[in-house]
Amino acid sequence: MARSIVVLGAQWGDEGKGKIVDWLTSRAQYVVRYQGGHNAGHTIVVDQQKITLHLIPSGILHNHVTAVIANGVVLSPFSLIKEMKMLLKLGVSTCKRIFISASCPLLLPYHVAMDLARENHHISKAIGTTGCGIGPSYEDKVARRALRVSDLYNLKYFKNKLKDVVDYYNFQLVYYYKTKPINYQIVLEEVMSISDILIDMVVDVPELLDDAAKRGDSVIFEGAQGSLLDIDHGTYPYVTSSHTIAGSVSVGAGVGLNYIDYVLGIVKAYSTRVGFGPFPTELSNDTGNWLCMNGNEFGSTTGRRRRTGWFDAVSVRYSVKINSFFSCCLTKIDVLDGLKELKICIAYRKKNGKVIHNFPCSLEELENCVPIYEILPGWMISTVGITEFHQLPKESQLYVKRIEELIGVPIHIVSTGSDRSAIIILRNPFDS
């Protein structure tokens, strides 16, 4: 029986991971974020109430679950406190239920200022980031100048290091980007006002998770963004600044490879992408607009409209390879209700006419690929809220089975709506 389950997106993010993590954690004791930051936007709908979490793991909505933010996450302390207050207003207790790693790099206002300055300065070369400061924060980590949660234990050291880092950023912000400098004193005072809260939440994450395994507790690792946005394996440079694939769990949470029992890929029934970058199956027509509006495809972090397109089996098959998914969950199939026909991309045609079935690693090559489609019949019957596979329209069942064949792994879960109860379980990962 699976005890440790990794849940991550197989596309460009926004696949519906939050709902599935929320569902899985009904049988788990711990839920762990291991990469990314508050650029994530994981939405759960409980009793028609929409709750969006950016930093705190989605499983926190279950009172028996302990939420952990591990070392691979760049931690915005202000976003964390804001989210905790939001949960308290909703009646969700966070006391002694949220823990953080002392090794988390702190994401502070100068990271946000730099992120926005770069995007505005190089508009023609913009990546389309969320503007949350994620990239600059990871840069500091790699350059070994990041302030970490552990630095808060030594106030004198923290003050001196913060001054050096603020000076470093202000030189660039003022003299290169021609924008306003960051006020060191304000940043210091803001961090100091919540430092005791952060220190009280610190735990030895590898030790905590090791003890959990010894007790036989179940742990859900919640990925952010999607596999095609991985800094190494995604559509570089139009990617996020962290590793989003399954292998990053070990580094980002401090657990060995043998700790992981199961990897579940989350796949949307069509494709979406936020920001810039190649998108072979993108639809810039009425169908694309219909998918956007019917699927409410607007970013939960930025509010930006998502680009939409047909399901791309080539890219998802690539995600299956680099993650070794045990199975997949197909989400938002209900969004396709009412379409007379559906298309699935089964291959790409290159500029020279050659047909390829593998996802290109070259950005230029991918940008010049044209999708080759297989057409399937749509369905006119609503699938919203269906909980048994045999109750789905036959055309819908065919669509699920065809995707399963094309991506090479079984689909064990199908989501049929935004509510946590709108779900079809063909095989529970915990029972695998």
Swiss-Prot record:
Q: Which cofactors does it use?
A: Mg(2+)
Q: What is its EC number?
A: 6.3.4.4
The UniProt entry's GO CC annotations, sorted and at most eight, read: cytoplasm
Annotated Gene Ontology MF terms? adenylosuccinate synthase activity; GTP binding; magnesium ion binding
Subcellular localization, as worded in the UniProt entry: Cytoplasm
Q: Where does GTP bind?
A: 13-19, 41-43, 306, 332-334, 415-417
Q: Which InterPro entries match?
A: Adenylosuccin_syn_GTP-bd, Adenylosuccin_syn_Lys_AS, Adenylosuccinate_synth_dom1, Adenylosuccinate_synth_dom2, Adenylosuccinate_synth_dom3, Adenylosuccinate_synthetase, P-loop_NTPase
**Reactions catalysed:** IMP + L-aspartate + GTP = N(6)-(1,2-dicarboxyethyl)-AMP + GDP + phosphate + 2 H(+)
Q: Where does IMP bind?
A: 14-17, 39-42, 130, 144, 225, 240, 304
Tell me a GO biological process for this protein.
Answer: 'de novo' AMP biosynthetic process
Principal place of residence: cytoplasm
Query: Which positions are annotated as binding substrate?
Result: 300-306
Cofactor comment text = Binds 1 Mg(2+) ion per subunit.
Main enzyme class: ligase
Keywords from the UniProt entry: Cytoplasm, GTP-binding, Ligase, Magnesium, Metal-binding, Nucleotide-binding, Purine biosynthesis
Pfam families on file:
Adenylsucc_synt
| Active-site feature positions | 14, 42
Q: Which residues bind Mg(2+)?
A: 14, 41
- From the UniProt record, give the pathway where this protein acts: Purine metabolism; AMP biosynthesis via de novo pathway; AMP from IMP: step 1/2
Q: Which HAMAP family match?
A: Adenylosucc_synth (MF_00011)
Q: State the family named in the UniProt similarity comment for this chain.
A: Belongs to the adenylosuccinate synthetase family.
PANTHER family in alphabetical order: ADENYLOSUCCINATE SYNTHETASE
What the protein does comes down to: Plays an important role in the de novo pathway of purine nucleotide biosynthesis. Catalyzes the first committed step in the biosynthesis of AMP from IMP.
What is its quaternary makeup? Homodimer.
Q: What is this protein called?
A: Adenylosuccinate synthetase
Source gene? purA
